[in-house]
């Protein structure tokens, strides 16, 4: 290569280098200036790939009635922003109304805003530097606090309320129910009614043969169940120990059961033949119904013996002349035409005890004294 050619190359390179250096700064300076000098463009046109400046383009937009998914999102965003603005304005108006009502009621004037320290932040209040202005107490007991961010005054204050201290709830006593306090006891059992056994007799009248040496002027009654029904006719008492009762020593009085036969209406046929202290016997003179009457009488005696709740006899019972008793001596003579007295075995002396009465149809009632 000639020296002249090398000198020309140097000159060309020297001439081109300043131009290149001048071009590079121009390209680097356009990049940061674009965001600063960029004017707002239409969002609808931008969604469709068209760049149009927003100034004077609101009525001339070609995609103003477009309903694609991108344009629908733009509409929803505008509606949300409009609702936020309306809510903020409503809160500001409500806060001003509450403040005016508090001042009219004579509340204390608002104090100067105080700076909240970082260590004195209460729970429930967001952290940060906000100006807290105490407000008058509301009727419900909550103390409203107005938080105003220091850098954003245009959004308006936010109204917060602190819950009041825990107060005891009003207690209403429950009215007493049907069951009172304490241990409940069931009501006492009532006395069962007396066992009633009715025996029908169809035979003519037969006189009664009592024990010898008994007084007919003594009557036996039931004090708890009231007096027995007064019926015309003769009444008789038979005293005989039941099977299974303790007899005891011979020198002590025997505890026996007394069978009282009370007749109602016309006198019926009845023949009582007392036996020894160890047994008792009822002799009936009726023919066809003798076995039936004996069976019913035996069932009545067993039921009376098993009865555990029977009334007690009182010794101070007034005598009744209508009763023909066999408990005392000096019995009356037999009526004319009758069979008379038939004493068999030694007399029995009853002791006070319980008694249960049985009504026997035309014959009357049977009472067992134990």
Curated annotation (Swiss-Prot):
<dbReference type="Pfam" id="PF15791">
    <property type="entry name" value="DMRT-like"/>
</dbReference>
<feature type="region of interest" description="Disordered">
    <location>
        <begin position="1"/>
        <end position="38"/>
    </location>
</feature>
<dbReference type="GO" id="GO:0007141">
    <property type="term" value="P:male meiosis I"/>
</dbReference>
<keyword id="KW-0539">Nucleus</keyword>
<dbReference type="InterPro" id="IPR031577">
    <property type="entry name" value="DMRT-C1/C2_C"/>
</dbReference>
<feature type="region of interest" description="Disordered">
    <location>
        <begin position="334"/>
        <end position="356"/>
    </location>
</feature>
<dbReference type="GO" id="GO:0005634">
    <property type="term" value="C:nucleus"/>
</dbReference>
<protein>
    <recommendedName>
        <fullName>Doublesex- and mab-3-related transcription factor C2</fullName>
    </recommendedName>
</protein>
<comment type="function">
    <text>May be involved in sexual development.</text>
</comment>
<keyword id="KW-0726">Sexual differentiation</keyword>
<dbReference type="InterPro" id="IPR001275">
    <property type="entry name" value="DM_DNA-bd"/>
</dbReference>
<dbReference type="GO" id="GO:0043565">
    <property type="term" value="F:sequence-specific DNA binding"/>
</dbReference>
<keyword id="KW-0862">Zinc</keyword>
<dbReference type="GO" id="GO:0006355">
    <property type="term" value="P:regulation of DNA-templated transcription"/>
</dbReference>
<dbReference type="InterPro" id="IPR026607">
    <property type="entry name" value="DMRT"/>
</dbReference>
<dbReference type="GO" id="GO:0007548">
    <property type="term" value="P:sex differentiation"/>
</dbReference>
<dbReference type="GO" id="GO:0042802">
    <property type="term" value="F:identical protein binding"/>
</dbReference>
<keyword id="KW-0221">Differentiation</keyword>
<comment type="similarity">
    <text>Belongs to the DMRT family.</text>
</comment>
<feature type="DNA-binding region" description="DM">
    <location>
        <begin position="42"/>
        <end position="89"/>
    </location>
</feature>
<dbReference type="Pfam" id="PF00751">
    <property type="entry name" value="DM"/>
</dbReference>
<dbReference type="GO" id="GO:1990837">
    <property type="term" value="F:sequence-specific double-stranded DNA binding"/>
</dbReference>
<keyword id="KW-0805">Transcription regulation</keyword>
<keyword id="KW-0238">DNA-binding</keyword>
<dbReference type="GO" id="GO:0046872">
    <property type="term" value="F:metal ion binding"/>
</dbReference>
<dbReference type="GO" id="GO:0070828">
    <property type="term" value="P:heterochromatin organization"/>
</dbReference>
<keyword id="KW-0804">Transcription</keyword>
<dbReference type="GO" id="GO:0001741">
    <property type="term" value="C:XY body"/>
</dbReference>
<keyword id="KW-0479">Metal-binding</keyword>
<dbReference type="InterPro" id="IPR036407">
    <property type="entry name" value="DM_DNA-bd_sf"/>
</dbReference>
<dbReference type="GO" id="GO:0007290">
    <property type="term" value="P:spermatid nucleus elongation"/>
</dbReference>
